[in-house]
A protein has these predicted regions:
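Conserved ABC ATPase "signature" region
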Residues: 101, 116-134
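Conserved structural motif at the start of ABC-family nucleotide-binding domains
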Residues: 6, 20-21
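Conserved ABC transporter NBD signature motif
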Residues: 60-68, 77
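The feature captures the beta-strand-to-loop junction immediately N-terminal to the Walker
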Residues: 37-39
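Helix-to-loop junction immediately C-terminal to a conserved catalytic motif
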Residues: 52
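Catalytic Walker B motif of ABC-type/P-loop ATPase nucleotide-binding domains
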Residues: 163-167
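ABC ATPase nucleotide-binding domains
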Residues: 228-254
Length: 254
C-alpha cells in the first residue's frame, strides 16, 4: 500500500511529433503542497490535467491513493480529488451559491436534493474565500478575481483529501493571492498547484517540481531547488536572491 496520495511514473504525452511530457516521475506527499513551475510551454498544465484524467497518458501511470487512475470512474475520482482548472465551462447565468454547491454533487446519494451537510460545506467554503456576501450574485456580474475565488470555493466544498489547482492566483490581486495560498496551507490538505510566480512557490509550497521541455529539471524543497543558478538554467534569466522576514525572495534582472 502506497503512502502517497498521488504517484506519477514515467508519464509521457505527445501531440503529433511534439513531446509535451517526457517520462515524468514524482510522488505527492500527504498533507503537503507541491508546486509545479517552469517556463511557458514546459508542460505544466498538461501534467496537471493528467492528474485528474482530463488528459490521458500515452505512456506511464498515475495512481490515486494507490489505485491506477485509468481504472477509476470520473465519479470515483471526484470524491478523492477536487480541481480548479484554467478552462471552465460557461456558467455565467449561474448564481455563486449554485456553482459552489456543485462541489457537493459527488457526495450525493440520490437525486432528491442537497442535505444539511451539503449546505454547511457550501457555507463554509464561501466564508473561507470571503464570498459569503456574494452568494446570490450571478457569475457574469463578478470580476475575474471574484469568479476565481468562487471556483476555489467550489473545490473546497467538495471536501476531498486532494486538490489540484491550475494557476489559482490568476486574476487575483496581491492581497487575495496570498490569502488563498495561505488558506490552502492552513487547511493542511494535499495540494498540487501550478504557479508561475516563483516567489509564491518559495513562500507557500513544501515541495516543487520545475519542468523544462516536458522533463523534470529539478525536484525538491523550494530552498534546495530554487536558486539563482537553477533559475538561470531553466528560465534563462538572472535573479538576485534576497531574504524578506526570513523568507527567500527573488528579484529578476533583465
Amino acid at each position: 500500500m502506497s503512502d502517497f496520495p498521488l504517484s506519477v511514473r514515467n508519464a509521457s504525452i505527445s501531440f503529433g511529433e511534439r513531446t509535451v511530457l517526457n517520462h515524468v516521475s514524482f510522488n505527492v506527499l500527504p498533507n503537503r503542497i507541491l508546486g509545479i513551475a517552469g517556463p511557458n510551454g514546459s508542460g505544466k498544465t498538461t501534467l496537471l490535467r493528467s492528474l485528474f484524467g482530463a488528459q490521458p497518458l500515452h505512456e506511464g501511470e498515475i495512481r490515486l491513493f494507490d489505485v491506477p487512475l485509468k481504472k477509476l470512474k470520473p465519479s470515483q475520482i471526484s470524491t478523492q480529488l477536487a480541481v480548479v482548472s484554467q478552462f471552465e465551462y460557461d456558467a455565467s447565468r449561474m448564481r455563486v451559491w449554485d456553482l459552489v454547491m456543485l462541489g457537493r454533487a459527488p457526495h450525493r446519494k440520490d437525486m432528491q436534493g442537497y442535505s444539511k451537510v451539503d449546505v454547511t460545506h457550501t457555507q463554509r467554503a464561501l466564508s473561507l474565500v470571503g464570498m459569503s456576501d456574494a452568494k446570490d450574485r450571478y457569475l457574469h456580474s463578478l470580476s475575474g478575481g471574484e469568479r476565481q475565488r468562487a471556483l476555489i470555493a467550489r473545490a473546497l466544498a467538495q471536501d476531498c483529501p486532494c486538490i489540484v489547482l491550475d494557476e489559482p492566483t490568476n486574476h487575483l490581486d496581491i492581497t487575495y493571492q496570498h490569502q488563498i495560498l495561505a488558506l490552502i496551507r492552513e487547511l493542511s490538505t494535499t495540494a498540487v498547484i501550478v504557479l508561475h510566480d516563483l516567489n509564491l512557490v518559495s513562500r507557500y509550497c513544501d515541495d516543487v517540481i520545475v519542468l523544462k521541455d516536458g522533463k523534470v529539471a529539478c525536484y525538491g524543497t523550494p530552498s534546495d531547488v530554487l536558486t539563482p543558478s537553477t533559475i538561470r538554467e531553466t528560465y534563462d534569466i538572472d535573479t538576485l536572491e534576497v531574504r524578506d522576514s526570513g523568507m527567500k525572495q527573488f528579484i529578476f534582472r533583465g
